[in-house]
Design a protein with these regions (language model features):
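HDAC/HDAC-like amidohydrolase catalytic core signature
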Residues: 1-133
Length: 133
């Protein structure tokens, strides 16, 4: 079992990012850490790498589909992303729940677009569905 691997940034034209691209470009250069979510020069790069790890994990699972051994993935990435909204940057909280890009939403959109599969998202924290509902 491979426990860790480096990730590549998610491509800017990933299905889930198409609508958010202009927002990201406009938000990050001038964002100030005045909300709960702190932003630095490397925040967007880190968020894209975290989302890229999720996309790579999904591709890895599908690469093993139908083989004798099953394959699963768990992505423990920073910054978190499961609460990020596609429609904006919260002026008080910043990236909404300390999240910039919704890794789960990006991964689900990738699974549908690249592998033609339906996706179920099970969000079991206290803010269930926040960012993917």
């Amino acid at each position: 079992m491979q426990k860790s691997r480096p990730s590549s940034p998610v491509r800017p034209l990933s299905p889930f990012l198409v609508g958010a691209g202009a927002l990201l470009d406009a938000t990050f250069p001038g964002a100030k850490p005045d909300g709960m979510t702190h932003v630095s020069a490397g925040s967007l790069r880190a968020a894209r790498r975290a989302a890229g790890a999720v996309v790579a994990a999904i591709d890895g699972v599908f690469a093993h589909a139908g083989k004798e051994t099953s394959h699963a993935a768990f992505c423990l990435v920073r910054p978190p992303g499961h609460h990020a909204m596609v429609d904006g940057w919260d002026k008080v909280a910043g990236g909404n729940g300390f999240c910039f890009l919704n890794n789960v939403g990006i991964g689900a959109a990738h699974a549908i677009a690249a592998h033609g599969k339906r996706v179920a998202i099970v969000d079991f924290d206290v803010h269930h569905g926040n960012g993917t509902e």
